[in-house]
A protein has these predicted regions:
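Short gly/ser/thr-rich secondary-structure transition/capping motifs
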Residues: 1, 8-13, 83-91, 139-147, ...
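A short, aliphatic-rich alpha-helical micro-motif
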Residues: 2-5, 19-22, 98, 152-157, ...
C-alpha cells in the first residue's frame, strides 16, 4: 500500500478499497472481464482514471479448459483413474459423449462462443446460447435466449456451461432451484 502512491498503471486485480492510495493512478487494467466493482468513480484518487478489462483475452484457453473438464465429467475420469489405479479391469463405466448432447452456454461472449464452436465440431445435437439480448449470435449456436428465458431452457439442457463476467446481473444467476429444473 505504501508503494501504491507511485503507481500510474495497475494491471491485475486490486481490491477497490485500496485504489485511493494510488494517488498517481492513470490506468487500471483488470485481468478479467467483469469490472462492475470498479465502475464507481469515487473509488479512484481522481475521476480521470482509465478503466479497462481483459474481455476477449482468454476465449481459446478457457474454452479448451471447459471442454477438457466437460469430457472428464462425461467420461467419469476420477472413477476411471481409480479403476486403473486399483487394477479393477472388470468394472465398467457408462460414458457419455458431447456428440448428440444438448448444451446450454450461459454467456455468449468470447469464452462461451469459443466453447460452443468446439462443442459443435464434436457433434453436439443442439447448442443454446443465453445472454442479455436475443440478437443473432455466432453460427455455433442453434438457438438464442435471454436471461429472462433461462428457466425455460434449463429443462432441455444436458450440459450447462457458465461463461459469464462477474456483474450485478450475473451474480447468483443460478440457484439450487434453477439447477433442479
Amino acid at each position: 500500500a505504501d508503494q501504491a502512491a507511485d503507481y500510474e498503471i495497475i494491471y491485475g486485480m486490486c481490491p477497490p478499497q485500496e485504489l485511493k492510495a494510488a494517488a498517481n493512478l492513470k490506468w487500471l487494467c483488470c485481468s478479467f472481464a467483469g469490472v462492475d466493482a470498479y465502475t464507481d468513480e469515487t473509488i479512484y484518487p481522481n475521476p480521470d482514471v482509465l478503466l479497462s478489462n481483459s474481455s476477449g483475452a482468454y476465449g481459446i484457453t478457457i474454452s479448451e479448459h471447459i471442454l477438457m473438464v466437460t469430457l472428464m465429467m462425461l467420461r467419469q475420469m476420477p472413477k476411471f483413474e481409480e479403476i486403473v489405479k486399483n487394477r479393477e479391469w472388470e468394472k465398467g463405466l457408462s460414458m457419455r459423449s458431447i456428440c448428440g448432447s444438448s448444451i446450454t452456454v450461459l454467456g455468449t461472449g468470447d469464452i462461451g462462443t469459443n466453447f460452443a464452436r468446439r462443442a459443435k465440431a464434436l457433434g453436439a445435437k443442439v447448442i443454446r446460447g443465453v445472454r442479455r439480448t436475443k440478437k443473432a449470435g455466432d453460427p455455433a449456436y442453434d438457438e438464442m435466449y435471454t436471461f429472462e428465458e433461462l428457466d425455460s431452457v434449463l429443462p432441455k439442457t444436458e450440459i450447462l456451461v457458465m461463461a459469464l463476467p462477474a456483474t450485478k446481473e450475473t451474480n447468483h444467476i443460478l440457484s439450487r432451484e434453477r439447477i433442479a429444473l
